[in-house]
């Protein structure tokens, strides 16, 4: 909250994209040891500033927090959305690697327009 307030106070929040999270969550239950394993089917990301619609919650997990149950987002969707917020069209960003043209978002990815301000 302090970072967001400081950027807002300085007039920099609209031009700064804040991203917090990871490409996987944790299993909602113990795995029989002291920890919980990775869970790529249900995870949380936080985006603020930089063209993101504030106060928006997008998607939903099942009642256990195990898997996306509503509006699932792939890591490619997240990358496409972040690139869009930075003013880049992910479909136009290609590079040549091992005799193949590749996009930064691989062969998938859609901008999540519902979170764009």
What annotation goes with each model-predicted range?
Residues 1-117:
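Ligand-binding pockets and gating/stacking loops
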